[in-house]
């Protein structure tokens, strides 16, 4: 499944963020027609001390730098965003206004989720959207490598965060590797959309509120340091940019 392939890349980038003292939330922007990675982002709130420096905005800035503001509007309908954690309400609104094609995410955002957990910004009718966007929303697919995304967040929150306004006592921080909340598919998809997305073989996952994969977590993926991920992504983004310029000259 292409979704798993691309989400693995996003998870690797989130692990890199964790190793650099950032909240482990990361994303990649994939050009859907070609399957090429065109931009990436990870949270930068700790380093920048900027509350809006979310992974999605970091990637959007890369696309703007590459294509210009007008180019962003033209290309976003052909982009699939893979992000380890459900976009917050702010990011979900920005993605909708940019007319993004699709969002695929790992785990829900229990406090600020904008794709179904708290609000369904991607489907509401009040957010401003481009005039040519008759659908007034975007498709959102949850639960891809969900447990891996949850575990990276747990790794972060059991650490001492010096920038937290009220640091928790170390004795209160216990790493849980065994239990996970139910996967509430119905918050994001109805059963018909779920089956259309994942296939009838997974129908019972919807009813039983369980993950698509087995109960195991890919520990190798989330426990390995990802020192080369930035270089890999930079090379992929350069290749996409090269192909864009090559096409524009034809």
Swiss-Prot record:
Cofactor(s) demanded: Zn(2+)
List positions binding Zn(2+).
54, 88, 91
Q: Name one GO molecular function term.
A: zinc ion binding
A cellular component term, taken from the record's GO annotations: nucleus
The UniProt keyword set, sorted, is: Cytoplasm, Hydrolase, Metal-binding, Nucleus, tRNA processing, Zinc
Tell me yes or no: is Hydrolase among this UniProt entry's keywords: yes
Major subcellular location class? cytoplasm
Enzyme class name: hydrolase
Query: In the UniProt record, does the keyword Metal-binding occur?
Result: yes
Record's subcellular location: Cytoplasm; Nucleus
Reactions catalysed: adenosine(34) in tRNA + H2O + H(+) = inosine(34) in tRNA + NH4(+)
Q: Which residues form the active site?
A: 56 (proton donor)
Xref: Gene3D superfamilies: Cytidine Deaminase, domain 2
Q: Which residue range or ranges hold the CMP/dCMP-type deaminase domain?
A: 1-119
State which Enzyme Commission number(s) the record gives.
Answer: 3.5.4.33
One GO BP annotation here? tRNA wobble adenosine to inosine editing
Other notes: Present with 830 molecules/cell in log phase SD medium.
Quaternary structure? Answer: Heterodimer with TAD3.
PANTHER family from the xrefs? Answer: CYTOSINE DEAMINASE FAMILY MEMBER, TRNA-SPECIFIC ADENOSINE DEAMINASE 2
* Family, as annotated: Belongs to the cytidine and deoxycytidylate deaminase family. ADAT2 subfamily.
Record function comment:
Structural subunit of tRNA-specific adenosine deaminase, which deaminates adenosine-34 (the first, also called wobble position of the anticodon) to inosine in many tRNAs. Inosine-34 allows the decoding of 3 different nucleotides at the third position of mRNA codons, as inosine is able to pair with U, C, and A.
Protein name (Swiss-Prot/TrEMBL): tRNA-specific adenosine deaminase subunit TAD2
According to its UniProt entry, this protein's organism is Saccharomyces cerevisiae (strain ATCC 204508 / S288c)
């Amino acid at each position: 499944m292409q979704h798993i392939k691309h989400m693995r890349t996003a998870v690797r980038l989130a692990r890199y963020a964790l190793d650099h003292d950032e909240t482990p939330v990361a994303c990649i922007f994939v050009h859907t027609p070609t399957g090429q990675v065109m931009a990436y982002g990870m949270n930068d709130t700790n380093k920048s001390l900027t509350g809006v420096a979310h992974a999605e905005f970091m990637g959007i800035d890369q696309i703007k730098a590459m294509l210009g503001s007008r180019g962003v509007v033209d290309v976003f309908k052909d982009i699939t965003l893979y992000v380890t954690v459900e976009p917050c309400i702010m990011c979900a609104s920005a993605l909708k206004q940019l007319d993004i094609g699709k969002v695929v995410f790992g785990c829900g955002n229990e406090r600020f989720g904008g794709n179904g957990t708290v609000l369904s910004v991607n489907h509401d009718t009040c957010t401003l959207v481009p005039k040519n966007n008759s659908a007034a929303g975007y498709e959102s697919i949850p639960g891809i490598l969900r447990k891996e995304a949850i575990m990276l967040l747990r790794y972060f929150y059991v650490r001492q965060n010096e920038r937290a306004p009220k640091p928790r006592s170390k004795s209160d921080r216990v790493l849980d590797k065994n239990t996970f909340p139910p996967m509430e598919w119905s918050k994001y998809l109805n059963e018909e959309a779920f089956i259309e997305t994942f296939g009838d073989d997974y129908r019972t996952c919807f009813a039983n509120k369980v993950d698509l994969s087995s109960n195991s977590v890919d520990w190798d993926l989330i426990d390995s340091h990802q020192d080369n991920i930035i270089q890999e992504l930079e090379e992929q983004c350069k290749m996409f940019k090269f192909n864009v310029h090559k096409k524009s000259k034809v």
